[in-house]
Amino acid sequence: MILGTGLDLTELGRIRAALERQPERFPRRILHDSELAAMPRLSVAWLAARFAAKEAAAKALGTGFTGGVAFRDIEVYKELSGKPCLRFHGAAFEHAQKMGVKKIHLSLTHGRDTAAAVVILEG
């Protein structure tokens, strides 16, 4: 059963501007430690796709970034096959547990000017 869905479209220019203003602080504020370690240098599209995934996940949880849920509580990682996946930590994990989330589906894409993500939470 579908418990939540979320969609986000992020402008690459917005992420580029944030990186130019705060090249160290911005990624540290939104990325989980494992994502920081995997972040390609100066990859706006990579970062924008993760930003979109986190926004979409927060929407699917129904919380947005309130109630203690933070960007760093939502981790995007890749399976060995290269498939992108989501993992919840902290308040996001607790909320997903309360909802009865058993499976998380994530789809990412990016083009010249935008990155997008869709998240489906299944129970």
UniProtKB/Swiss-Prot annotation:
Signal peptide: none annotated. The gene is acpS. Its main location: cytoplasm. Its cofactor is Mg(2+). Pfam families: ACPS. Its EC number is 2.7.8.7. Keywords: Cytoplasm, Fatty acid biosynthesis, Fatty acid metabolism, Lipid biosynthesis, Lipid metabolism, Magnesium, Metal-binding, Transferase. GO terms for cellular component: cytoplasm. It comes from the Bacteria. GO terms for biological process: fatty acid biosynthetic process. It comes from Oleidesulfovibrio alaskensis (strain ATCC BAA-1058 / DSM 17464 / G20). Mg(2+) binds at residues 8, 55. One of its GO terms (molecular function) is holo-[acyl-carrier-protein] synthase activity. Transfers the 4'-phosphopantetheine moiety from coenzyme A to a Ser of acyl-carrier-protein. Belongs to the P-Pant transferase superfamily. AcpS family. This is Holo-[acyl-carrier-protein] synthase. The keyword Cell wall biogenesis/degradation does not apply.
